[in-house]
Amino acid sequence: MKISAIALLASVATLLPAVEGWGEWASFHGLDRQTFHNKVDAYNDRDWVVTYMSAFTNSHGNISYNLIMENPEKSPSWHTYYEQTADDYRGIVKYRRDLGFRLIQTDAHTGTTINSFLMLWNANNRDIPWADHINQSSDEFTTAIKDYTRNGYRLKSLSGYGFGDRLQQFASVWEKASGAPQRVYIGLTAAEYKTKFDQARKDGYYPVKISPYNFGKEVRFAGIFEHMDNNAVKPECQWGLTSDEYVKVFNNWRKKGYKPTVVNGYRDGGEKYAAIFNKVTNAKV
């Protein structure tokens, strides 16, 4: 199985501490571009697959990457792209769709000069209908939620990002599938996100995606929550973590048998991280 990881925009980033969980999965945060690329290649050589990736511009003005890889018993063919312009993104969508792939995740961030996109693709072996959007305004995304939900689609991936000093934009991936009810929020301050988070938990909804993002000097949060049965093992979500704090949180949840499924970075008086951890069974870490 041949996998590609392509970067069109090179940047030099400050390497931050990387945390690893060995065995069935591995997780890294705060990687520079070359280290990120090397990690993907090294694990690909061992037949591991990328399950999540994200990027953000750190306080030094360089791009830092976060990465989660797993060693599943079997998986569909997959491809990754990163540091794509909007035009590159649109060309890749047409190319990969024509080859029978579907977009699993898109992550957008305000780059050093322009907005950049990361993309994770899987072979669409089950012919699942899907759709994607980038550079949507808040109003456009809100309209999309209503339209796609009405037509039986679920939000699979959501990424918020800044455009200039005053405009928030959103990238999303949708798939036509049944599933638990969802709640989606965008444009929240940290305090507003905490309020929504607490209320969602009371109502039986738990985070499956969290996307903190910068626009200008502001920090905002977007997220997807899904309803879970009372007996289900719930995910754990934390944000506002420094790199060192994230390492401690990571180690704490790893000892309890959890793994990160989302790791996202942003700037807020320095580099901060947000993550979602899910319980795994028979995981070797």
Residue ranges and their predicted role:
Residues M1-E20:
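Fungal secretory targeting signals
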Residues A18-V285:
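Terminus-proximal functional modules
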